[in-house]
């Protein structure tokens, strides 16, 4: 049976249809908004795999290029490995949905959202999250939703729900927010140095609209008559759990007081081994032994949280708002254009900056067409940073997500291309990690940009905030969380910004929502922490270096008329190649007439710029030019005084004395000085070497 419902979501009319397409999926919905058509499907295994002790959820967002009537690029002409922007939207779907499955539910779940028809004015991220929630809500799969997603922009101080692709360009805020009827569960976005109050106002605005779409989903599920599966949870051995707690509580409590991550992990491991060996004397069942390991993890969770909530004590002895010790190094590497090392506790990021030219832009394909990026931040998280051994491969979803967050934090303080015409690549190499490595990347990246001479608007710092809460409403907000506190806490909230305001924000929860009272506490405490970090960073470098590295390219920009681009390029690129061969510089010409000239040194770039200027300069009567003899005739020499502009120096004007043969005085290829005597109506140029010599 087909079920359809429609409703208003801000300015958009949303239509939901099920029962016609993808009927064998456990949940499927066709989601429409204007010309945007999404198909969201979800399937779940009937039972968890034997021995499964985690929730295997896969979320995949895919853009089909046929949705805009285009062929995919590449040899095979089909969609292949997902590009970064699809991975980022997949993560936006995954992060708010994951904590809303029942605790202990370990059946494999696969959620897919596909763009079947695109609308160039509609931004997809919020709609994709909505479609995913609808598919889960109307399925028989256990899910503590529904939730809704909202993309929030702000233009001239006015908040906008689901701004168009054109509106978002002029917005000083770009947030994707997910929530239930009453609480926010996920935030991801960037802002142009907005205040805490402005950010909270945007979140309240989002929450109001989110509640509307959650209500629509509830009505839809009621219309369909959804019946959820029974969750099969493994029975707990209460007696064994009590014995484990009695034997291990004091040992685990002592081990958890160790501030050093490596030492602490070893001590916890030793306690766990000791407990397992002790109970093996009386417990023979292998499944029971595995249960003991689970109970030990639960006990550690209980110990860490009890210390924070009831004693106000963190495992490493810090106050709740205390930042770990910070150290900074500027330009530790001699070869790169700029570098820094930012260390906070046992988290360390090496930030490295490379300056490039227009040809180094990153080009990528989206539903809107080909796009280019002139700033990129790449985040690398090698196994050695956490003392592990694993196969090295390309960046995973986590690395792409962390890099994107740090990139968004920094890109809004970069100078405009007119002021600093370089392509910029920042790489964050995580050398060691104990929590908050993405925010360490923001700090090392900001420092390295200044060290490289990039005139950013201000230093940017980032901090990760945590939350411990209980069912009574008691909570504690933690600044600069370590890996242990991230693992056992309820929230990982990352906030980056300058002294003026916030530039990037990301929040993920392990609980079903967080109140605005808590969010206000988080923002206020995070700001104090960010400013403390900025104080330390700015003691080492507070403004961009006055000069670029010797190995950095030198760039000069020229703007030429769009209708004369072809003149500069020349037939088959002849002119551009000629300039490059003569000067060693490279030219990058954009469709709007912007010409970026880059040389390995200033002299090379200036020489090429002078030649570019020559193509569009007007010949001035009475001016002396240095030109190249291009051809020789019996009656004179043809001299190129500007690129593409030749004049005739008659034999009578080549020298003071009588000249029998032009070749007696000049030869092809000679560089000579000539004076412009006249330019007639047809553009013919009359030159004189003799007059130029008189003025020397």
Curated annotation (Swiss-Prot):
Major site of localization recorded for this protein: cytoplasm
Top-level taxon in the UniProt lineage: Bacteria
Names of the cofactor(s): Mg(2+)
GO cellular component, one term: cytosol
KH domain mapped to chain residues: 553-612
EC number: 2.7.7.8
Coiled-coil boundaries: none
Protein name: Polyribonucleotide nucleotidyltransferase
The gene coding this protein: pnp
